[in-house]
């Protein structure tokens, strides 16, 4: 007689099965120190009160030096209400396990840093010396340069964001300088019925060039863009969504455009230095009272007549042409620049904590790893090593 099965399941189904469990990463708790910027005319701060609130709500601590946000119009009270701790003790801020700065720390500030600290700031490789890297190495610091942090699409979010500000600002500054109150030609930067529009020449079709063109076109100016990359010129037309005068940098065409224009914006980048695109002779041929805004002055400038100026004394006149050659244009708008930088920093900080610390984040995020130039006191950036003739190691051999 055939026995009835006691279970509706097959013999195979009744065998013990492997259970797949989700492996939870242990979240890290961040203790972030934000010192007051001491660099000349630097008014920005890395995090807004809203960003601090988001971090504190996620269980992190933020210690801010008193007055750090004043330049960007964020008071100590704003940060305190967001959950930050405020101190007047600079050394206490620099003793935090993680330090956020806009400008790279000075040699005196590095002395205040504890060993094995994580430093996130700009690197500004062109302004550094071997002493800076030796000081970081002696403290066994893990350092990230935010201008080298790469996004998933291959772009550099911090550089792009600040370039957008610089591009838009260059047009607003030119508009101000053209007005009679600033000893300009008394011309309005706009499209007024019956009045010929302003002629603007933009050198360089990168992010700065794109946003300068966008702003100038929005104000009704006639815009001509020059760049030696056909791909970039094609791209700027697509981004702006309208036909535009574009040309490669040919001296004859450029001189013709310079003679007629009211404003020239220089935004040409080079590998080590910006190439000089506009010669002294070309500047002499320009209109009296025309405006030169050299955005690429931080890399040497692309006008032969360019000399570095400051936010306090931003202009000088040479060959009857007004020159504006301030290296750090976004610092003119510290609050906007702060919000922009903060929007980039905050997701990265939350992700670092979620991954269980900087080590794991560097392991999983190639873009963040690209910004690393020191790992526990070992130089990992090839470009820094070659620039300063320093020994460097491949980060992929240190983190795997």
Protein language model annotation of sequence segments:
Residues 91-107, 241, 245-277, 291:
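Rossmann-like NAD(P)-binding element
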Residues 126-153, 281-325:
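Rossmann-fold NAD(P)-binding glycine/threonine-rich loop
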Residues 16-135, 139:
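An N-terminal-biased, well-structured beta-alpha scaffold segment characteristic
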Residues 147-173, 177-188, 302-400:
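Adenosine-phosphate binding glycine-rich loop
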Residues 41-46, 109-112, 269-278, 302-306:
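Glycine/threonine-rich flexible loop motifs
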Residues 52, 76, 110, 133, ...:
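Generic hydrophobic/aromatic pocket-lining and core-packing "Φ" positions
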Residues 35-36, 40-69, 181-266:
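Glycine-rich phosphate/diphosphate-binding loop of Rossmann-like nucleotide-binding domains
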Residues 1-31, 37, 107-198, 326:
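Glycine/serine-rich phosphate-binding loop and adjoining beta1-alpha1 elements at the start
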């Amino acid at each position: 007689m055939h026995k009835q099965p006691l279970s509706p399941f097959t013999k195979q189904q009744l065998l013990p099965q492997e259970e797949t469990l989700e492996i939870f990463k242990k979240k890290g708790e961040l203790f972030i120190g934000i010192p007051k910027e001491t660099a000349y005319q630097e008014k920005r701060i890395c995090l807004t009160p809203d960003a601090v609130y988001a971090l504190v709500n996620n269980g992190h601590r933020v210690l801010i030096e008193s007055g750090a946000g004043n330049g960007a119009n964020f008071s100590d009270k704003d940060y305190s209400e967001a959950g930050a701790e405020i101190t007047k003790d600079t050394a206490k801020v620099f003793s935090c396990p993680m330090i956020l700065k806009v400008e790279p720390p000075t040699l005196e500030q590095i002395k205040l840093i504890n060993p094995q600290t994580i430093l996130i700031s700009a690197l500004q490789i062109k302004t550094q010396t071997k002493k800076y890297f030796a000081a970081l190495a002696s403290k066994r610091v893990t350092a990230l340069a935010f201008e080298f942090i790469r996004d998933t699409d291959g772009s550099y979010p911090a550089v792009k964001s600040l370039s957008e500000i610089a591009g838009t600002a260059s047009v607003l500054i030119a508009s101000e300088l053209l007005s009679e109150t600033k000893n300009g030609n008394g011309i309005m930067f706009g499209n007024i019925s019956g009045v010929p529009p302003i002629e603007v020449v933009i050198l360089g079709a990168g992010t700065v060039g794109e946003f300068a063109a966008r702003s100038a076109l929005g104000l009704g100016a006639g815009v001509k863009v020059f760049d030696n990359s056909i791909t970039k010129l094609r791209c700027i037309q697509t981004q702006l969504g309208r036909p535009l005068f574009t040309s490669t940098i040919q001296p004859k065409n450029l001189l013709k455009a310079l003679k007629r224009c009211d404003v020239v914006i220089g935004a040409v980048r080079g590998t080590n230095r910006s190439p000089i695109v506009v010669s002294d002779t070309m500047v002499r041929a320009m209109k009296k009272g025309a405006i030169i805004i050299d955005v690429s002055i931080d890399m040497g400038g692309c006008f032969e007549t360019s000399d570095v100026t400051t936010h306090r004394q931003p202009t000088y006149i040479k060959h009857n042409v007004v020159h504006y050659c301030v290296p750090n244009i976004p610092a003119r708008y510290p609050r906007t620049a702060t919000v922009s930088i903060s929007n980039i920093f905050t997701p990265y900080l939350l992700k670092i904590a979620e991954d269980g610390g900087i080590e794991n984040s560097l392991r999983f995020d190639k873009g963040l790893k690209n910004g690393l130039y020191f790992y526990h006191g070992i130089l990992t950036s090839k470009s820094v090593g070659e620039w300063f003739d320093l020994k460097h190691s491949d980060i992929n051999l240190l983190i795997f």
